[in-house]
Swiss-Prot record:
Biological or metabolic pathway of the protein: Amino-acid biosynthesis; L-arginine biosynthesis; L-arginine from L-ornithine and carbamoyl phosphate: step 2/3
Organism (species): Lactococcus lactis subsp. lactis (strain IL1403)
Positions that bind ATP: 10-18, 117
GO cellular component, one term: cytoplasm
CDD domains given in the database record: ASS
GO molecular function: argininosuccinate synthase activity; ATP binding
Protein name (database record): Argininosuccinate synthase
UniProt-listed Pfam families: Arginosuc_syn_C, Arginosuc_synth
Binding site for L-citrulline: 87, 123, 127, 175, 260, 272
Enzymatic reactions: L-citrulline + L-aspartate + ATP = 2-(N(omega)-L-arginino)succinate + AMP + diphosphate + H(+)
Subcellular localization: Cytoplasm
EC supergroup of this enzyme: ligase
Gene designation per UniProt: argG
GO biological process: argininosuccinate metabolic process; L-arginine biosynthetic process; urea cycle
InterPro entries assigned: Arginosuc_syn_C, Arginosuc_syn_N, Arginosuc_synth, Arginosuc_synth_CS, Arginosuc_synth_type_1_subfam, AS_cat/multimer_dom_body, Rossmann-like_a/b/a_fold
Length: 398
């Protein structure tokens, strides 16, 4: 007699994925629950045990924080990545890593399918499924929430009928997604773009009004584009991000209200809390300004925008993304140094920077007697630089 087919479920411990365990079991699958820790701050032991309680045959919990930080957040930092110049790709960065781990567990356990808890309305279904099929085209992907078409009340009724525990925070009016790089908030009163986000929606950040009245200064050291130390203390990247989240969040830094163009064709209203992301991205860009030649400083943002779009749209494993990340790695060889940042009332402001790769020459920039800039050379430069414009004027402005 053949056993049930195995399926690996991306498991969060929430209502949707807990109900999905029972629903998939009823469909004839042996469910392997797979929870990837990318810095949500959840009780992983509780999630592990709950998966078994609701019917999973096996529960896997993976610590992915440093891998998430170095590879995925690392690319975002090196590229100064902001979708639509506003959103630092909080959720979008975690999806390819989660998909990759789901595929690895599926292959290790001999599963024939993978399931996720995304709805049919958002970007994440695309990100997961494109990533999974990029890595393992042979695996079937099932989206229970997309298939069962239940209203929330029907889902709760199904859970009660099948002994699936109802989470204590189910009455939370907001949909939340959180990882090391930030926290996404949507739904509830936020669906009306005129409504101000209530203060009870925030978790990582103080309001500007409640932020300290005194500024705080931090120093972040970078090596090849990535932070390696905070205030002189060497730390793993995920630890630096965690600490900066706390420090910058206290000062009200990182709140973002975004009318976002989703991949699936609709606009959505999203709130984000990204204190570390905003702070570290500003510090990183400031160090690039110190160490990049002009041509690179002007050209790189063009590719940054393309890469942000690729990642937002679920194409992390596309060859174009791989090529652009390789370009970023090449540019970051000179991005070494320390940036001093002022944190005050919602603003993270770089106020000092130094680098062994600095292209800033005080002797060339100064207006004092120490000036080494050859001002006499400017006459010939100006004449040659403006020559095409001058010739055009002589020919056409008659």
């Amino acid at each position: 007699m053949m056993g049930n087919k195995k399926i690996v479920l991306a498991y969060s411990g929430g209502l949707d994925t807990s109900v999905a365990v029972k629903w998939l079991t009823d469909k004839g699958f042996d469910v392997i629950a797979d929870c990837m820790d990318v810095g949500e701050g959840k009780d992983l032991n509780f999630i592990h045990d709950k998966a078994l309680q609701v019917g999973a045959v096996e529960s896997v919990v993976l610590d992915c924080k440093e891998e998430f930080a170095k590879i995925f957040v690392g690319a975002a930092l090196k590229g100064n990545l902001m979708y639509e110049n506003k959103y630092p790709l909080v959720s979008a960065l975690s999806r390819p890593l989660i998909a990759q781990k789901l595929v690895e567990v599926a292959k290790e356990k001999g599963a024939t399918a993978i399931a996720h808890g995304c709805t049919g309305k958002g970007n994440d279904q695309v990100r997961f499924e494109v990533a999974i099929h990029s890595l393992a085209p042979e695996l079937e992907v099932i989206a229970p929430v997309r298939e069962w078409h239940w209203a929330r009340e029907e889902e709760i009724e199904y859970a009660n009928q099948n002994g699936v525990p109802i989470p204590a925070d189910l009455d939370n009016p907001y949909s939340i997604d959180m990882n090391l790089w930030g926290r996404a908030i949507e739904a509830g009163v936020l669906e009306n773009p005129w409504n101000t986000c209530p203060e009870d929606a925030f978790f990582m950040t103080n309001s500007v009004e409640n932020a300290p009245n005194e500024a705080e200064f931090i120093e972040v050291e970078f090596k090849e584009g990535l932070p390696i130390a905070l205030n002189g203390k060497s730390l793993e990247l995920h630890e630096i991000i965690k600490k900066v989240n706390i420090i910058a969040g206290k000062h009200g830094i990182g709140r973002i209200d975004h009318i976002e163009n989703r991949l699936v064709g609709i606009k959505s209203r999203e709130f984000y809390e990204c204190p570390a992301a905003i702070t570290l991205l500003k510090a990183h860009k400031d160090l690039e300004d110190l160490t990049f030649v002009r041509e690179l400083a002007h050209f790189k943002p063009v590719l940054e925008n393309e890469l942000a779009n690729l990642i937002y749209n679920g194409l992390w494993f596309n060859p174009a993304t791989k090529a652009l990340i390789a370009y970023l790695d090449e540019t970051q060889k000179v991005v070494n140094g320390i940036v001093k940042i002022k944190l005050y009332k919602g603003l993270a402001t770089p106020v000092g920077r130094k680098s062994t790769n600095s292209l800033y020459s005080e002797k060339l920039a100064t207006y004092t007697a120490a000036d080494e800039f050859d001002q006499a050379a400017a006459v010939g430069f100006i004449k040659l630089w403006g020559l095409p414009t001058q010739v055009n004027a002589q020919v056409n402005l008659k």
